[in-house]
Amino acid sequence: MAPAVKAAMERTLIFSIAAVYIALQLTKFELLIYLLGGLVFVAIVLLLPKLKGMTLWLTMSFMVTGAVLLWLQKADARIWFESAGINVTIVTLFLFAPLFGIPVRLPAYVEALKKFYEVNLRSKSALFLGTQLLTQLMGVFINVGSIPVVYQLVYVKPQPGMNLLLANALNRGFAGAILWSPYFAAMTLVTSALGLPWSSVLPYMLGLAILSLFVSWLVDSRELLHIDLAEPSQAAKKKERAVFPFGLGIYLIAAIIVILAMERVIDLPMVLLICLAALSYPLLWCFVKGEMTVYKEGFKNHVTVTLPALRKEITLFLAAGFFSGSIGVTKFGEIVPSLLEHIPLPVAVTFSIFTVALIAGTSLIGLHPIVPVTILAGSIDPLHVQISPIYFAVLLLGSWALSNPISPASAVNNLLAGLLKKTVFEVAMPNYKFAACMALGLMIYLLILVKF
């Protein structure tokens, strides 16, 4: 079969999964559960030959182990198909959410950002924190695409002494976006599994995102003191003024307000609201700005380049969802609380430590955080471990975010390693201390502000 035909089949299958999922959410027609699950099984079989290495073995392990567990539990056909469809929300998000990033890349905004960066971020701390904050803001809308965009801004003028520190800032900024972006797989997975609206966890996650900035600066403050920056540019020497692009600021703020307003007014799942907003809001913005050519190019690039590049993640996430469903059929959700009761600490505290250690520990050895998060969110009843659903959501999202910068399998670490011409471990290692401090900060934050 010709590669072009195969690629078209894969795209059609992925779009079909999203379409059936949306139809199921709108109609609640139960037969669609079987169609959706069947499409997922077909997609995994079709995409499996494209996988290599750890991703291939993990996907196969999840499918085989999940099938064995369901067979041992004598689960009926409905459970099999429901389990297969657990993570289709993420596939749907992959299809639509990246469209929000098209207006962010408008040439006028990128040029204005370059000047803003060059003129305003002159001190070492300002450059470090500004890079992290900008990556976080851009990451909310363009996901991993924020890394090359901000990288080009940061490294327009080489800063040899700060290369690795700025890479840390990029890495941790992306982790901050994981904490609160409604367009990320992490938020979709956790809020969907726990039945929470995004707005209910947003205040806590924004607080945690601010905490991550402080912890990041604290961890690297000693190194920042001993670095000499390059000479400022002529624009900076002349003290020219450069403000953050007004249009881009309005676009970013309005995108969040649109989602918050839709969540309150329209009684639909968050994923469907994001799909609706992603199809209309960026298109309308580019139309008003007279940048429809940029929109068409961005849309075409998303369908023909970005989506095919996500085949590995899509297959792994679907397999992880199936495995999570099989775990949910067992008594795993009851076993964990009963084991934790033997430890002489409050169950909520013990479970929090266990969760952070599990997600961070498995990420450290190369397992994607979605795997433990899917299992925990899908099989543990927060009330059984004496915590609230919101506490559980903050715990899972916080653990995922602090694990991302230390994972050798994360897309960000691999992308930065390529850009900096270093090994992925050289990029990840400086973040170990950050992850440890954030883990401690997360525990304190949960116990003081979120509570049980």
Identify the role of each PLM range:
Residues 2, 158-249, 413-445:
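Membrane-core helix-loop-helix motifs of multi-pass transport proteins
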Residues 75-107, 128, 132-133, 300-334:
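Core transmembrane alpha-helical segments of multi-pass membrane transporters/permeases
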Residues 12-17, 31-71, 90-97, 248-254, ...:
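Hydrophobic mid-bilayer segments of alpha-helices in multi-pass membrane transport proteins
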Residues 255-372:
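Transmembrane helical segments that form the transport core of multi-pass membrane transport proteins
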Residues 4, 210-298:
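Long, contiguous bundles of hydrophobic transmembrane helices that form the permeation core
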Residues 89, 117-129, 161-165, 309-313, ...:
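Membrane-interfacial loop-to-helix junctions in multi-pass transporters
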Residues 106-137, 149-163:
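Membrane-embedded helical hairpins/re-entrant loop segments and their flanking transmembrane helices
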Residues 150-161, 188-198, 345-404, 418-420:
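Membrane-interfacial helix-loop connectors
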